Amino acid sequence: RPSPLRRARRRVADALVLKRIRAVLGPNMRYIVSGGAPLASDLAQFYTGLGLTLLQGYGLSETTGPIAVQRIGDNPVGTVGQPMPGNFIKTAKDGEVLVRGVSVMPGYYGLPDQTRAVMPDGKWFHTGDLGSIDRRGHLTITGRKKEIIVTAGGKNVSPAVLEDSLSTHPLIAHVIVVGDQRPFVGALIALDAEMLPAWLRKHGLPVCSPTEAASLPQVRESLDRAIERANRAVSRAESIREYRIIDAVFTVENGYVTPSMKLRRSKVLADYSHEVDELYGGPAAPARERGLLRLLRRKKH
């Protein structure tokens, strides 16, 4: 239960700020429903802090829409709710979310091989998403299985945790965590050209282009702090150690972003492979060489 001081602060904030924001949203706004793409936790807390009820859900085309949704009065921030009636959700050993039930398709029409690939036992549909389930059955999505990074040391890293945290920084338009078959985790960062002028003025700096801003010490220091905060949510082996600011704009029109505003990771990595190599001082070692290095490490331990 909030302390008297916190309740007093809430009343002041409501009178001076929150009430005005709610007025912009409209007098009839009571609920906000989010789906289709992950909602950053700070945005979820912001809307909840306005006094609005935020409800999130999760589903795919193969599940006929939502298969998990939050309920009014039972909507913890960060989760996407519990299974819809008649449906069941569990996680595999590797963390992949598996679903079955009345909403789940029986298979892809006329495509038995593709059906077996996603429903090997004929019952549970393998979503390709990674997640966890709490004691009360609330599902939390933590990333995509195909996006898992395996470092040269064999550490599995889910980039979504780091990317979601960094994406909330006003200077960052897009961030992509890298490190597959590399000695450590790194990141490529594209600055937000729209937010940059306001940020520069706020910090007493002359307005300049993203390319020029990339070399400013104040910009670097701000990004360093953001990465330090993001790294607190992961282990040392999973943390970002180096990053590069790239001169790039990713949009739907140029093919780097999907219509649902998701970054096409494979295209970015292919087109910016030179920048990734620069981050690590050269291309990734051949598979045979990586295997020998891992063997030597095991012998040392």
Segments (PLM) and residue ranges:
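Glycine-centered loop/turn positions within well-structured domains
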Residues: 75-78, 95-97, 106, 139, ...
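C-terminal boundary motif of the adenylate-forming
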Residues: 130, 169-195
